[in-house]
Amino acid sequence: MTLLCLTSGVSASPFEEGVAKYKNADYMGAINAWRLAAATGNARAQLNLGVMYAKGQGVAQDYTEAFKWSRLAAAQGNADAQYSLGVMYDGGQGVAQDYVEAFKWYRLAAEQGDADAQYSLGVMYDEGQGVAQNHVRAYTWWSLSAASGHTNAKKVRELAEKNMTSQQILEAQKMIRECQHKKLQACT
């Protein structure tokens, strides 16, 4: 949950004002500007508020408030917010720990290409948290995560491969191709 959406465009909207204030380390000013943008449904502002509350930047650290803002952005399809919700459910931050919900939000972000979410799905499949344990699917998601640029996914996948049969590896490679062909949709 260390990502802030700082993409700025041409106009000086409340979101853009928040970006400028954040870049100048005026965290309270950024919070105020992003609250205005979030009130109009701006998912990037909602995500940023969630991150600020989670980190305690410009406000007291408050995971419940972080969850609230992240949930609003995630409901609009923001992959970073969906991943953040997965982390919160996974660790019980601002919400009761719930591996099934964590899996759900990681999957939504993973299907949009989020490498961290793809990695986390691999972990959940490997450990059987929120989903039935399945080493083939764990290997599949770690492979997809590595292809998306996750730095640890390749190492973890290689370790997992040592405990898999050649048939399991072939099955995983087939799943990887199918997932890539379907643009990551319905890969779980």
Describe these PLM feature segments.
Residues 19-21, 41, 53-59, 77, ...:
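Glycine-centered coil turns and helix-coil junctions that link the paired helices
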